[in-house]
Amino acid sequence: MKISCEIIGKVDSGDVSKISMENNNGVVISTLTTGATLQEFLVPMETGALKNIVLGFSDFEDYYKNNLCACQSIGRVAGRIGKASYTHNMVLYSLPKNEGDNCLHGGPKGMQVQNWNYVTNLNDDYVETKFIRRLYSSVDGFPGDVTVSISYRLNNNNRLTILFEAFDVTESTVFNPTNHVYFNLSDKQDLSSHELQIYSDYRLELDSELIPTGQKINVDETNYDFRKTTDLLPRIEANNGFDDAFVVGGGTCDHVKEVAILHDKESGDGIEIFSNRNGLVIFTMDDIEDNIYFARDKGKMAKRREAIAMEAQTLPDAVNHKGFGDIILDKGHSVNYEIGFQYFNSSR
Protein backbone atom coordinates (compact mmCIF):
# COMPACT_ATOMS: atom_id res chain seq x y z
CA MET A 1 0.00 0.00 0.00
CA LYS A 2 1.11 3.56 -0.57
CA ILE A 3 0.07 7.16 -0.17
CA SER A 4 0.96 10.43 -1.90
CA CYS A 5 0.11 14.08 -1.26
CA GLU A 6 0.27 17.18 -3.43
CA ILE A 7 -0.75 20.82 -3.10
CA ILE A 8 -3.20 21.67 -5.89
CA GLY A 9 -4.28 25.20 -5.00
CA LYS A 10 -4.97 27.77 -2.32
CA VAL A 11 -7.95 29.24 -0.49
CA ASP A 12 -8.08 31.97 2.12
CA SER A 13 -7.43 29.49 4.92
CA GLY A 14 -4.36 27.94 3.29
CA ASP A 15 -3.22 25.28 0.85
CA VAL A 16 -5.61 22.86 -0.82
CA SER A 17 -4.16 19.36 -0.95
CA LYS A 18 -5.00 16.15 -2.76
CA ILE A 19 -4.16 12.92 -0.97
CA SER A 20 -4.16 9.61 -2.87
CA MET A 21 -4.11 6.18 -1.23
CA GLU A 22 -3.56 2.92 -3.12
CA ASN A 23 -3.88 -0.65 -1.88
CA ASN A 24 -2.09 -3.72 -3.17
CA ASN A 25 -4.94 -4.50 -5.58
CA GLY A 26 -4.65 -1.22 -7.46
CA VAL A 27 -7.72 0.43 -5.90
CA VAL A 28 -7.08 4.15 -5.42
CA ILE A 29 -8.90 6.56 -3.10
CA SER A 30 -8.23 10.28 -3.61
CA THR A 31 -9.44 12.94 -1.21
CA LEU A 32 -9.28 16.73 -1.05
CA THR A 33 -8.81 18.94 1.99
CA THR A 34 -11.63 21.21 0.79
CA GLY A 35 -14.81 19.68 2.13
CA ALA A 36 -12.88 16.57 3.24
CA THR A 37 -14.03 15.37 -0.16
CA LEU A 38 -13.85 11.92 -1.74
CA GLN A 39 -12.65 12.93 -5.21
CA GLU A 40 -11.86 9.53 -6.72
CA PHE A 41 -12.72 5.90 -6.06
CA LEU A 42 -10.67 4.26 -8.80
CA VAL A 43 -11.03 0.55 -9.50
CA PRO A 44 -9.05 -1.49 -12.04
CA MET A 45 -10.80 -2.79 -15.13
CA GLU A 46 -9.87 -5.93 -17.05
CA THR A 47 -7.96 -3.74 -19.52
CA GLY A 48 -5.75 -2.52 -16.70
CA ALA A 49 -7.14 0.99 -16.89
CA LEU A 50 -8.75 2.61 -13.86
CA LYS A 51 -12.42 3.60 -13.65
CA ASN A 52 -13.75 6.23 -11.26
CA ILE A 53 -17.00 4.95 -9.76
CA VAL A 54 -17.90 8.21 -7.98
CA LEU A 55 -18.63 11.70 -9.26
CA GLY A 56 -15.86 14.23 -8.84
CA PHE A 57 -14.27 17.28 -10.42
CA SER A 58 -10.72 17.75 -11.66
CA ASP A 59 -10.64 21.33 -10.30
CA PHE A 60 -11.49 21.72 -6.61
CA GLU A 61 -13.15 25.08 -7.32
CA ASP A 62 -15.82 23.34 -9.42
CA TYR A 63 -17.28 21.75 -6.30
CA TYR A 64 -18.59 25.17 -5.29
CA LYS A 65 -20.15 26.12 -8.63
CA ASN A 66 -23.23 23.91 -8.06
CA ASN A 67 -25.33 22.57 -5.20
CA LEU A 68 -24.62 18.84 -5.62
CA CYS A 69 -22.20 18.52 -2.67
CA ALA A 70 -20.58 15.80 -4.77
CA CYS A 71 -18.89 13.26 -2.49
CA GLN A 72 -18.23 15.92 0.15
CA SER A 73 -18.38 15.52 3.91
CA ILE A 74 -21.71 16.92 5.09
CA GLY A 75 -22.49 18.34 8.53
CA ARG A 76 -22.83 19.18 11.24
CA VAL A 77 -26.20 17.68 10.30
CA ALA A 78 -26.89 15.99 6.97
CA GLY A 79 -30.26 16.47 5.34
CA ARG A 80 -32.95 18.94 6.29
CA ILE A 81 -33.86 20.30 9.70
CA GLY A 82 -37.44 21.52 9.52
CA LYS A 83 -37.94 25.24 10.20
CA ALA A 84 -34.19 25.40 10.88
CA SER A 85 -34.85 24.89 14.58
CA TYR A 86 -35.17 22.34 17.36
CA THR A 87 -35.84 22.27 21.09
CA HIS A 88 -33.60 20.53 23.63
CA ASN A 89 -33.99 20.72 27.40
CA MET A 90 -36.72 23.31 26.89
CA VAL A 91 -34.34 25.59 24.96
CA LEU A 92 -35.24 26.59 21.39
CA TYR A 93 -32.24 26.59 19.05
CA SER A 94 -32.38 28.47 15.75
CA LEU A 95 -30.11 27.42 12.89
CA PRO A 96 -29.13 29.13 9.62
CA LYS A 97 -31.71 28.83 6.84
CA ASN A 98 -30.40 27.96 3.39
CA GLU A 99 -33.36 26.21 1.74
CA GLY A 100 -36.49 28.26 2.28
CA ASP A 101 -37.31 28.13 5.98
CA ASN A 102 -35.19 25.01 6.51
CA CYS A 103 -31.57 24.20 7.23
CA LEU A 104 -30.01 21.86 4.65
CA HIS A 105 -26.72 19.96 5.02
CA GLY A 106 -25.37 22.02 7.89
CA GLY A 107 -26.30 25.38 6.42
CA PRO A 108 -24.29 27.67 4.14
CA LYS A 109 -21.11 27.31 6.22
CA GLY A 110 -21.26 23.56 6.75
CA MET A 111 -18.37 21.10 6.79
CA GLN A 112 -18.38 20.85 3.00
CA VAL A 113 -17.16 24.44 2.55
CA GLN A 114 -14.35 24.19 5.10
CA ASN A 115 -10.70 23.50 4.26
CA TRP A 116 -9.45 20.76 6.57
CA ASN A 117 -6.09 19.91 8.10
CA TYR A 118 -4.93 16.32 7.67
CA VAL A 119 -2.49 13.63 8.70
CA THR A 120 -1.76 10.30 7.03
CA ASN A 121 -1.07 6.84 8.37
CA LEU A 122 0.26 3.73 6.65
CA ASN A 123 0.42 0.39 8.45
CA ASP A 124 0.08 -3.33 7.72
CA ASP A 125 -3.73 -3.24 7.90
CA TYR A 126 -4.74 -0.08 6.04
CA VAL A 127 -3.72 3.27 4.66
CA GLU A 128 -5.49 6.28 6.14
CA THR A 129 -6.08 9.98 5.60
CA LYS A 130 -7.48 11.73 8.66
CA PHE A 131 -8.99 15.20 8.33
CA ILE A 132 -9.51 17.33 11.42
CA ARG A 133 -11.02 20.74 12.06
CA ARG A 134 -12.47 22.81 14.86
CA LEU A 135 -16.00 23.94 13.98
CA TYR A 136 -17.02 27.25 15.52
CA SER A 137 -20.54 28.34 16.32
CA SER A 138 -19.65 31.85 15.19
CA VAL A 139 -18.96 30.47 11.70
CA ASP A 140 -21.54 27.76 10.99
CA GLY A 141 -24.37 29.01 13.22
CA PHE A 142 -24.83 25.78 15.17
CA PRO A 143 -24.64 25.82 18.97
CA GLY A 144 -21.31 25.09 20.57
CA ASP A 145 -17.80 24.73 19.23
CA VAL A 146 -16.72 21.17 18.45
CA THR A 147 -13.72 19.35 17.02
CA VAL A 148 -14.48 16.92 14.19
CA SER A 149 -12.26 14.30 12.59
CA ILE A 150 -13.06 12.43 9.37
CA SER A 151 -10.91 9.42 8.51
CA TYR A 152 -10.77 7.62 5.18
CA ARG A 153 -9.30 4.12 5.55
CA LEU A 154 -8.56 1.77 2.65
CA ASN A 155 -7.54 -1.84 3.24
CA ASN A 156 -6.40 -4.68 1.00
CA ASN A 157 -9.87 -6.21 0.99
CA ASN A 158 -10.95 -3.24 -1.14
CA ARG A 159 -13.00 -1.73 1.65
CA LEU A 160 -13.16 2.02 2.17
CA THR A 161 -14.24 3.00 5.67
CA ILE A 162 -15.17 6.56 6.62
CA LEU A 163 -15.03 7.32 10.34
CA PHE A 164 -16.57 10.46 11.83
CA GLU A 165 -15.75 11.59 15.35
CA ALA A 166 -16.95 14.68 17.22
CA PHE A 167 -15.47 15.65 20.59
CA ASP A 168 -14.43 18.54 22.84
CA VAL A 169 -17.78 20.29 22.48
CA THR A 170 -18.30 23.49 24.47
CA GLU A 171 -22.09 23.19 24.81
CA SER A 172 -24.92 20.91 23.72
CA THR A 173 -25.13 20.66 19.93
CA VAL A 174 -26.31 18.30 17.18
CA PHE A 175 -24.17 16.02 15.02
CA ASN A 176 -25.35 13.78 12.18
CA PRO A 177 -22.76 13.79 9.38
CA THR A 178 -22.48 11.81 6.17
CA ASN A 179 -20.59 11.66 2.92
CA HIS A 180 -22.75 12.80 -0.01
CA VAL A 181 -21.27 10.15 -2.28
CA TYR A 182 -22.64 9.70 -5.81
CA PHE A 183 -22.05 6.34 -7.47
CA ASN A 184 -22.08 5.31 -11.11
CA LEU A 185 -20.41 1.93 -11.39
CA SER A 186 -20.50 1.77 -15.19
CA ASP A 187 -18.55 3.66 -17.84
CA LYS A 188 -21.75 5.30 -19.13
CA GLN A 189 -23.63 8.46 -18.16
CA ASP A 190 -26.72 6.65 -16.94
CA LEU A 191 -27.82 3.97 -14.49
CA SER A 192 -29.39 1.64 -17.06
CA SER A 193 -27.27 -1.37 -16.09
CA HIS A 194 -27.51 -0.84 -12.33
CA GLU A 195 -29.46 -2.85 -9.80
CA LEU A 196 -30.10 -1.95 -6.18
CA GLN A 197 -30.98 -3.73 -2.97
CA ILE A 198 -31.83 -1.86 0.26
CA TYR A 199 -32.48 -3.73 3.49
CA SER A 200 -35.45 -1.61 4.46
CA ASP A 201 -39.11 -2.26 5.22
CA TYR A 202 -40.00 1.39 5.72
CA ARG A 203 -39.37 4.81 4.24
CA LEU A 204 -40.11 8.22 5.72
CA GLU A 205 -43.18 10.17 4.68
CA LEU A 206 -42.13 13.63 3.50
CA ASP A 207 -44.04 16.87 3.11
CA SER A 208 -43.89 19.19 0.09
CA GLU A 209 -40.58 20.64 1.34
CA LEU A 210 -39.09 17.14 1.79
CA ILE A 211 -39.26 17.44 5.57
CA PRO A 212 -40.24 14.22 7.38
CA THR A 213 -43.75 14.25 8.83
CA GLY A 214 -42.79 11.76 11.53
CA GLN A 215 -44.56 8.86 9.85
CA LYS A 216 -42.90 5.72 8.51
CA ILE A 217 -44.52 4.05 5.49
CA ASN A 218 -44.22 0.37 4.64
CA VAL A 219 -42.53 -0.10 1.26
CA ASP A 220 -44.43 -3.29 0.42
CA GLU A 221 -45.73 -3.34 -3.19
CA THR A 222 -44.50 0.19 -3.92
CA ASN A 223 -41.74 1.73 -6.03
CA TYR A 224 -39.74 2.01 -2.80
CA ASP A 225 -39.48 -1.74 -2.25
CA PHE A 226 -35.83 -2.64 -2.90
CA ARG A 227 -35.72 -5.54 -0.45
CA LYS A 228 -34.93 -7.82 -3.37
CA THR A 229 -32.35 -6.90 -5.99
CA THR A 230 -34.17 -4.60 -8.40
CA ASP A 231 -33.30 -2.95 -11.71
CA LEU A 232 -32.80 0.67 -10.73
CA LEU A 233 -33.59 2.80 -13.79
CA PRO A 234 -37.17 1.53 -14.31
CA ARG A 235 -37.92 2.37 -10.68
CA ILE A 236 -36.42 5.84 -11.04
CA GLU A 237 -38.57 6.50 -14.09
CA ALA A 238 -41.74 5.08 -12.51
CA ASN A 239 -41.25 7.15 -9.36
CA ASN A 240 -40.12 10.30 -11.19
CA GLY A 241 -36.86 10.07 -9.30
CA PHE A 242 -35.93 9.61 -5.67
CA ASP A 243 -34.95 11.99 -2.89
CA ASP A 244 -36.01 9.78 -0.02
CA ALA A 245 -34.98 8.35 3.32
CA PHE A 246 -35.16 4.65 4.13
CA VAL A 247 -35.17 3.12 7.59
CA VAL A 248 -32.30 0.60 7.73
CA GLY A 249 -30.50 -1.52 10.26
CA GLY A 250 -33.70 -2.47 12.01
CA GLY A 251 -34.17 1.18 12.90
CA THR A 252 -31.35 1.07 15.46
CA CYS A 253 -27.97 2.76 15.74
CA ASP A 254 -26.00 0.23 17.75
CA HIS A 255 -23.50 -1.52 15.48
CA VAL A 256 -22.28 -1.63 11.88
CA LYS A 257 -24.61 -3.48 9.52
CA GLU A 258 -24.92 -3.96 5.78
CA VAL A 259 -27.70 -1.67 4.58
CA ALA A 260 -27.58 -1.76 0.76
CA ILE A 261 -25.90 -3.18 -2.34
CA LEU A 262 -25.46 -1.35 -5.65
CA HIS A 263 -24.33 -3.46 -8.62
CA ASP A 264 -23.58 -2.86 -12.28
CA LYS A 265 -24.65 -5.90 -14.29
CA GLU A 266 -22.43 -5.17 -17.28
CA SER A 267 -19.06 -4.63 -15.60
CA GLY A 268 -19.75 -6.72 -12.50
CA ASP A 269 -18.60 -3.87 -10.28
CA GLY A 270 -20.50 -3.47 -7.04
CA ILE A 271 -20.54 -1.66 -3.71
CA GLU A 272 -21.87 -3.01 -0.43
CA ILE A 273 -22.78 -0.20 1.96
CA PHE A 274 -22.37 -0.56 5.72
CA SER A 275 -23.45 1.80 8.50
CA ASN A 276 -23.97 1.94 12.25
CA ARG A 277 -26.95 4.28 11.86
CA ASN A 278 -30.61 3.87 10.99
CA GLY A 279 -31.07 5.89 7.81
CA LEU A 280 -30.11 5.74 4.15
CA VAL A 281 -31.01 8.64 1.87
CA ILE A 282 -31.00 8.05 -1.87
CA PHE A 283 -31.06 10.88 -4.39
CA THR A 284 -31.07 10.35 -8.15
CA MET A 285 -30.02 13.77 -9.51
CA ASP A 286 -33.38 14.51 -11.05
CA ASP A 287 -32.71 18.23 -11.36
CA ILE A 288 -29.23 19.17 -12.47
CA GLU A 289 -27.80 22.47 -13.58
CA ASP A 290 -26.19 23.03 -16.98
CA ASN A 291 -22.45 23.31 -17.49
CA ILE A 292 -21.43 20.69 -14.94
CA TYR A 293 -18.56 18.51 -16.10
CA PHE A 294 -17.47 15.56 -13.98
CA ALA A 295 -13.94 14.28 -14.47
CA ARG A 296 -15.12 10.75 -15.26
CA ASP A 297 -17.22 12.02 -18.20
CA LYS A 298 -14.14 13.18 -20.14
CA GLY A 299 -15.46 16.48 -21.42
CA LYS A 300 -19.14 15.58 -21.73
CA MET A 301 -21.66 17.67 -19.81
CA ALA A 302 -23.28 15.92 -16.85
CA LYS A 303 -26.67 14.36 -17.39
CA ARG A 304 -29.80 14.14 -15.29
CA ARG A 305 -29.95 10.86 -13.36
CA GLU A 306 -26.35 10.09 -14.18
CA ALA A 307 -25.62 8.74 -10.71
CA ILE A 308 -27.24 7.87 -7.41
CA ALA A 309 -26.32 9.45 -4.09
CA MET A 310 -26.41 7.02 -1.17
CA GLU A 311 -26.07 8.86 2.13
CA ALA A 312 -25.81 6.77 5.28
CA GLN A 313 -26.86 8.77 8.33
CA THR A 314 -29.26 8.94 11.25
CA LEU A 315 -32.75 9.57 9.88
CA PRO A 316 -33.24 13.16 8.63
CA ASP A 317 -34.70 15.75 11.02
CA ALA A 318 -34.17 13.25 13.83
CA VAL A 319 -33.84 16.03 16.38
CA ASN A 320 -37.49 16.94 15.79
CA HIS A 321 -39.01 13.43 15.77
CA LYS A 322 -39.22 10.92 18.59
CA GLY A 323 -37.96 7.51 17.54
CA PHE A 324 -35.80 8.76 14.65
CA GLY A 325 -32.52 8.52 16.58
CA ASP A 326 -30.53 10.68 18.98
CA ILE A 327 -28.20 13.22 17.36
CA ILE A 328 -27.74 15.42 20.44
CA LEU A 329 -24.10 15.77 21.49
CA ASP A 330 -23.78 17.16 24.99
CA LYS A 331 -20.81 18.91 26.54
CA GLY A 332 -18.28 16.43 27.86
CA HIS A 333 -19.35 13.70 25.46
CA SER A 334 -18.04 12.39 22.14
CA VAL A 335 -19.57 10.34 19.34
CA ASN A 336 -18.30 8.07 16.56
CA TYR A 337 -20.01 7.05 13.32
CA GLU A 338 -18.90 4.65 10.59
CA ILE A 339 -19.76 4.21 6.93
CA GLY A 340 -18.25 1.36 4.91
CA PHE A 341 -18.03 0.88 1.15
CA GLN A 342 -16.99 -2.64 0.19
CA TYR A 343 -15.99 -2.83 -3.47
CA PHE A 344 -16.40 -6.13 -5.31
CA ASN A 345 -16.62 -7.46 -8.84
CA SER A 346 -19.08 -10.29 -9.43
CA SER A 347 -17.55 -11.43 -12.72
CA ARG A 348 -13.95 -12.01 -11.63
From Swiss-Prot:
Q: What is this protein called?
A: Aldose 1-epimerase
Q: Which SUPFAM superfamilies match?
A: Galactose mutarotase-like
**InterPro entries given in the database record:** Ald1_epimerase_CS, Ald_epimerase_bac, Aldose_1-epimerase, Aldose_1/G6P_1-epimerase, Gal_mutarotase_sf_dom, Galactose_mutarotase-like, GH-type_carb-bd
The GO molecular function terms of this record are:
aldose 1-epimerase activity; carbohydrate binding
Q: Does the keyword NADP apply?
A: no
- Alphabetized Pfam families for the sequence: Aldose_epim
Pathway in which the depicted protein is active? Carbohydrate metabolism; hexose metabolism
Which biological processes are named by the entry's GO terms? galactose catabolic process via UDP-galactose, Leloir pathway; glucose metabolic process
Entry's EC annotation: 5.1.3.3
Query: Which reaction is catalysed here?
Result: alpha-D-glucose = beta-D-glucose
Q: What class of enzyme is it?
A: isomerase
Catalytic residues, chain numbering = 180 (proton donor), 311 (proton acceptor)
Residues at which substrate binds: 80, 243
Function recorded in the entry: Mutarotase converts alpha-aldose to the beta-anomer. It is active on D-glucose, L-arabinose, D-xylose, D-galactose, maltose and lactose.
Per the record, its GO cellular-component terms are: cytoplasm
**Sorted UniProt keywords:** Carbohydrate metabolism, Isomerase
Source superkingdom = Bacteria
Its family remark reads:
Belongs to the aldose epimerase family.
